[in-house]
A protein has these predicted regions:
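SAM/dcSAM-binding transferase cores
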Residues: 118-170
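The AdoMet/dcAdoMet-binding core of the Class I SAM-like
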Residues: 1-77
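Alpha-helical subdomain
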Residues: 58, 86-89, 103, 163-169
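Generic structural "secondary-structure junction" signal
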Residues: 20-22, 88, 112, 144
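Generic domain-boundary/flexible-linker signal
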Residues: 12, 59, 92, 130-133
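C-terminal substrate-binding/active-site "lid" region of AdoMet-derived donor-dependent transferases
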Residues: 65-129
C-alpha cells in the first residue's frame, strides 16, 4: 500500500488520533503532491483511490484530464481508479467528462448520497459486469459478518438509470 499525502500535518494527525501505523513492508507513506507523484512514478497499481480536497473543497490538479490520464497510465492491465467527488460542485459534470475521456468511456459515477459525496470509477482491462442481486447478497453478508451496511448503496443503484436490467456494467 502506498499512500501519498501533500500535508505532513495530516499524516501526523492520522498517527496521533486515528492510529495510523508506522510504515513497514506492507505500507509506505510519501509526503508529496499526488498529481506530481502519479506523473513521475514508474510503479503500477491495481487500485488508485483519490480523495483530495483542500479546506475550501477544491481538488486542484487532482481533478484534471492530465491527472486522470496519468492515473490510467499507472494502472495495471485490470486496474481501477476510484475518485471521491462532490456532486454539488458546479464542476461535477465536467469531472465525470474528464474521467470518461481519460478512460475512453470506461467511467461511471455512482448516485451521490445526501451529503453530496459521489464516488466515480474508471477501469482498464476487461468489462466489469455484476448483477445487482449478487451485490445485494454480498451487502447482506457484509452487514451480517462485519456490521458494514452497504444495502442503502445497493438500493440507490437499483433505482439508477445506469443499472436498468439489474446489471452494473463498467
Amino acid at each position: 500500500l502506498t499512500v501519498v499525502e501533500i500535508e505532513p500535518a495530516v499524516v501526523a494527525t492520522a498517527r496521533q488520533h486515528f492510529k495510523l501505523p508506522d510504515e513497514d513492508a506492507r505500507m509506505r507513506i510519501i509526503v508529496d503532491d499526488g498529481a506530481d507523484y502519479v506523473a513521475t512514478t514508474r510503479h503500477r497499481f491495481d487500485l488508485i483511490l483519490v480523495d483530495g480536497f483542500d479546506a475550501e473543497a477544491r481538488t486542484g490538479m487532482l481533478d484534471t484530464l492530465p491527472f486522470y490520464v496519468n492515473c490510467r497510465a499507472r494502472l495495471s492491465e485490470e486496474g481501477l481508479l476510484v475518485v471521491n467527488l462532490l456532486s454539488k460542485r458546479k464542476e461535477f459534470e465536467r469531472s465525470i467528462e474528464r474521467l470518461e475521456r481519460a478512460f475512453d468511456g470506461r467511467a461511471l459515477c455512482f448516485p451521490s448520497c445526501d451529503s453530496g459525496n459521489a464516488v466515480a470509477f474508471a477501469a482498464t482491462g476487461d468489462m466489469i459486469d455484476h448483477r445487482l442481486s449478487d451485490l445485494r447478497a454480498t451487502a447482506r453478508a457484509l452487514k451480517r459478518d462485519t456490521n458494514l451496511n452497504l444495502l442503502p448503496t445497493v438500493m440507490r443503484l437499483e433505482g439508477w438509470h445506469r443499472c436498468d436490467g439489474g446489471q452494473l456494467v463498467l
